[in-house]
A protein has these predicted regions:
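Extracytoplasmic
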Residues: 49, 210, 261-263
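Protruding loop/beta-arch "assembly-hinge" segments enriched in small, turn-prone residues
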Residues: 1-28, 229-237, 245-319
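Extended, solvent-exposed, turn-rich assembly/linker loops in the middle of proteins
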Residues: 140-218
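Long, contiguous amphipathic alpha-helices that act as assembly "spine/axial" helices in icosahedral shell
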Residues: 54, 81-144, 173-181, 215, ...
């Protein structure tokens, strides 16, 4: 019987591509449209450097002028100014020992797909944790006065009224919000109250909704002292682009480990950009070449750039 060698599978170029594809298709953040792949962001992620300026035109304002038949009356043009966001590239990796990998392969016709699914599932969870940490950072200061609805002082639980008051933070731009991310405890409470609806999609896949918002359940949502954090998002509120590590997947064998029994290690690497639109990464307290989760969650590393109504993220704090 032929033996499947891990090294013969993971060194194939299509393996890393398969892991990348699975990690996004499995993610509710991607499937809901909250995180949107952007070719321009992907081009930056594939280029050299760690931080990138994203220029944009500031909105224009002012009132129209009244026409005149006096040729000496001249209109004064207003300025059209340009500013920029700043995105940061994330360099992330992980590794697993052969014991776990070998056991997980088991029997089957497609061990490559089995390994790819395992690693992709891990990347899906890890990328969601990364995003939650970034949200913690931007709401700690940059968006704290404009995009946060806090009802913890009144000991109010998450409800329809709380969410509707939260979306009002964007005023007449609130219709741009389409999904809500919440802790499983809050999701279960809404289920008990029979407030969750299930909408069918292609392939008979059903997903939960609340007040018309698609619900994404993630226990990475902060919970502190009985205070739960939920987030309202609009489509494309987080831009995403995948880079190209020199060696995305690597297999190592240490024949002397275990007193000669040998040890196998599988390493996976990703370079990508997760950028909340309308924010600037300042790097004010970043120590290394790429931010840690703690640094992403640090208030001073983010600055608000866009007008309030253009930033399609709202934080809700409730009991």
């Amino acid at each position: 019987m032929a033996v499947t060698q891990i090294t013969n599978l993971v060194v194939k170029p299509e393996f890393a591509a398969r892991v990348q594809a699975l990690s996004t298709t499995k993610s509710a953040l991607f499937q809901s449209g909250i995180v949107a792949a952007d070719p321009a962001i992907a081009a930056l992620a594939k280029s050299e450097g760690a931080t990138f300026k994203l220029p944009y035109w500031n909105d224009i304002s002012g009132d129209s002028e009244v026409g005149s038949d006096d040729p000496n009356t001249v209109i004064t043009p207003s300025n059209i100014a340009m500013s920029y966001e700043t995105a940061v590239k994330l360099f992330r990796s992980n590794a697993w020992s052969a014991m776990d990998i070998t056991k997980s392969i088991g029997a089957g016709d497609d061990p490559l797909e089995r390994i790819a699914n395992l690693i992709a599932g891990w990347w899906t969870r890890d990328m969601q944790t990364i995003l939650i940490n970034a949200l913690t950072g931007i709401f700690a200061s940059a968006l704290s006065s404009t995009h946060v609805h806090d009802v913890t002082g009144a000991s109010t639980a998450l409800s329809a009224d709380v969410i509707l008051d939260g979306k009002q933070k964007l005023g007449d731009a609130a219709d741009s919000l389409s999904a809500i991310v919440m802790h499983s405890a809050k999701y279960t409470a809404l289920q008990k109250a029979l407030l969750i609806d299930y909408i069918g999609a292609e392939g008979d896949i059903r997903f939960p909704t609340f007040l018309g918002y698609r619900v994404i359940v993630d226990d990475s949502c902060p919970l502190a002292n009985g205070n739960y954090t939920s987030y309202l998002f609009g489509p494309g509120s987080v831009a995403y682009g995948e880079g190209s590590p020199k060696v995305p997947t690597e297999y190592l064998r240490s024949p002397l480990a275990g007193n000669g029994a040998g040890q196998e290690t599988l390493v996976t690497r990703r370079e990508f950009i997760f950028h909340p639109r309308g924010l600037r990464w300042t790097s004010s307290s970043m120590v290394g070449s790429s931010p840690t989760n703690t640094e992403l969650a640090t208030a001073g590393n983010w600055a608000k750039m866009w007008d309030t109504k253009r930033i399609k993220i709202v934080k809700i704090l409730s009991k």
